Amino acid sequence: MHYPLSLALAFLPFGIQAQQTLWGQCGGQGYSGATSCVAGATCATVNEYYAQCTPAAGTSSATTLKTTTSSTTAAVTTTTTTQSPTGSASPTTTASASGNPFSGYQLYVNPYYSSEVASLAIPSLTGSLSSLQAAATAAAKVPSFVWLDTAAKVPTMGDYLADIQSQNAAGANPPIAGQFVVYDLPDRDCAALASNGEYSIADNGVEHYKSYIDSIREILVQYSDVHTLLVIEPDSLANLVTNLNVAKCANAESAYLECTNYALTQLNLPNVAMYLDAGHAGWLGWPANQQPAADLFASVYKNASSPAAVRGLATNVANYNAWTISSCPSYTQGNSVCDEQQYINAIAPLLQAQGFDAHFIVDTGRNGKQPTGQQAWGDWCNVINTGFGERPTTDTGDALVDAFVWVKPGGESDGTSDSSATRYDAHCGYSDALQPAPEAGTWFQAYFVQLLTNANPAF
């Protein structure tokens, strides 16, 4: 999976040696290349695996990326008449009782992503790219989910919910809702390498994860008057459907189920609506995978005592599939269920038959250009010929789908193309992956430019 940049950048001086280009790697565990940057760039430590050359002028403060545009919000379009029943706008109403939990709210604009665009992207849009500055500014204002991909990021949830609470108290109309991704399972990303997490099952990872969830719950209880939308553990359950032949996934199965159960039961709060990640059409939409996937999702839901706050499933997270497409691209390899609408309408009845009346959200953050440049449907890393997609809205035209959302912040890398890196995944070196690419979660300027250029609708 693919996860966002660390909370802030720490700037470290290095000795005089060969210089790395802007956005290139300049440090990290196991790295042996150039450790200084060209003029106008500064080497910024992102995490233990990666340091990146970023524009010096836009990153002089280690707190810039955390604080810029923290009060910005954007409304969610709610003009459709084909939705699930619209419920009360009260942030303390249980999601399952109030219908579509997105209706009647505007979504909080991810302040960290907004400041990445302002501090990293826009200063580099010069010369022939200067015409994209207005589009970049607009993209920064589109609400996207905040990823809680390490325990260290959990306190920022409190900062953001406090800001939302303050704006709502000041009369925000419609009231603002927060959006977060819960993403820190032990032995995370078990079928890939690019987004390995901080916890290991062998090193008390399950207990560490439960503490992580406890911290999130504490914040949600503290801000019980703020309506909060959660996506739960991208890729995790989908890996248990198709990848148990991978030793790491087989070994992680019981821990994934225990941890997911803990998350669903502990975060089952009146001000919360949760969506379990459900892969995408190119993963679980295959006819042979639909019933096993439905069986697993229904089992997880029922084993958690059918939590009222679990509204349904999230699809296409960090992926590229069309919501609907008239002709299946060649890379869908003969599967007639080749878009997210078909996938959702195929799996929903299978869930309903087992007592899980699931509704859905779809990540449209990077699916604006169709077909994409994928050579194979399973190619997921920094895929070429992609663009920003439909803006967040409840106007989906399908009663099963609560909203189109931007879960993956567009412009943050899916994984490094450096084959010598500790977390290198071969998918990031494929011919349909934009290269050279930095580590997962770090800013990838060329990819952001691609998304802007191919945005549909355009900014």
UniProtKB/Swiss-Prot annotation:
A molecular-function term among this protein's GO annotations: cellulose 1,4-beta-cellobiosidase activity
Keywords: Carbohydrate metabolism, Cellulose degradation, Disulfide bond, Glycoprotein, Glycosidase, Hydrolase, Polysaccharide degradation, Secreted, Signal
Enzyme class: hydrolase
Catalytic residues, chain numbering: D189, D235, D414
Domain notes: Has a modular structure: a carbohydrate-binding module (CBM) at the N-terminus, a linker rich in threonines, and a C-terminal exocellobiohydrolase catalytic module. The genes for catalytic modules and CBMs seem to have evolved separately and have been linked by gene fusion.
SMART domains in UniProt: fCBD
Organism: Aspergillus niger (strain ATCC MYA-4892 / CBS 513.88 / FGSC A1513)
Protein name (Swiss-Prot/TrEMBL): Probable 1,4-beta-D-glucan cellobiohydrolase C
Cysteines joined through disulfide linkages: C26-C43, C37-C53, C190-C249, C381-C428
Keyword Transferase among UniProt keywords: no
Domain CBM1 as annotated: residue spans: 19-54
Family: Belongs to the glycosyl hydrolase 6 (cellulase B) family.
